UniProtKB/Swiss-Prot annotation:
Name used for this protein in its record: Tyrosine recombinase XerS
Keyword Cell cycle (UniProt): yes
Transmembrane segments: none
Family statement drawn from the similarity comment of this UniProt entry: Belongs to the 'phage' integrase family. XerS subfamily.
SUPFAM superfamilies: DNA breaking-rejoining enzymes
GO biological process, one term: chromosome segregation
InterPro entries: CB, DNA_brk_join_enz, Integrase-like_cat_sf, Integrase_catalytic, Integrase_recombinase_N, Integrase_SAM-like_N, Recomb_XerS, Tyrosine_recombinase_XerCD
Regulation: FtsK is required for recombination.
Protein's organism: Streptococcus pyogenes serotype M12 (strain MGAS9429)
Tyr recombinase domain: residues covered: 169-354
GO cellular component: cytoplasm
Amino acid sequence: MRRELLLEKIETYKAIMPWYVLDYYQSKLAVPYSFTTLYEYLKEYKRFFDWLMDADLTQAPKIADIDLSTLEHLTKKDLEAFVLYLRERPSLNTYSTKEGLSQTTINRTLSALSSLYKYLTEEVENDQGEPYFYRNVMKKVSTKKKKETLASRAENIKQKLFLGDETLAFLDYVDKEYEQKLSNRAKSSFRKNKERDLAIIALLLASGVRLSEAVNLDLKDVNLNMMIIEVIRKGGKRDSVNVAGFAKGYLESYLAVRQRRYKAEKQDLAFFLTEYRGVPNRMDASSIEKMVGKYSEDFKIRVTPHKLRHTLATRLYDATKSQVLVSHQLGHSSTQVTDLYTHIVNDEQKTALDNL
């Protein structure tokens, strides 16, 4: 979603929210949470507040009038009823016959509510320096995790990674072969953004940064002499990320055309730009997802930017056998998250042995 459209949608949701949600929004913006995260959270709050009114758990005539007392006095049974509603409600997607939301979506809804309740009961201060209330009912609501062993997950993910020589082969394919099958009109569009698209793919494969971190990258955050970029990690922490050397040429080629091709001025801070009717804008997450999907599908299999992150992590673990190093590269505080890559690499080693 384009940044301008995203901000418009955020303002639409803010206009109907209670004052304490607006306080929450302002507080998290200062962390900073990304606009995309805050937008998703606001959507979840609307879903929840709509249900409160439909279930007669508030007498408020509209969402903005739902008071803190309502949230304070909700019971565990009330929240469990909300979860059941999410699980059993007819799907709003007319193309799907499945009823109810997926467990992943339900977990996301509960995560958003947990964040709001934590803010209201622990983080915010009233005039007396106390939180708005103390009872956090969300601490009593458990979420159901998807049951899958690491070995099973590794097997599912492995097919969507560009390991070994495939990392550079993918970049080489986009650079030299992709356009050969395009029409003349399509070639013109491809060539306009070729350097930028290659730079994005190379950066994701060479650093393992999250999609949001790549989107929010500014020109000042990129040091090609040191091959280091500065990103804002989850939770608002600033981090320096090393970038593998194979990405340097692609990034330099993009920088050489960035200003001229995208009409960039001094005030255009975003590193990755798109241009529409002569106006440069920060490239958004949706556009990058579509771009990566388009090229990867033509090369081998359609993947997301997150799979390119998995690719870097797996290759780095294979080269170093250090979960600590991989955790630091990905911006994780624990090595537990990187257990997945040990399973992928071990499976690759077994395959190699079987071929001896």
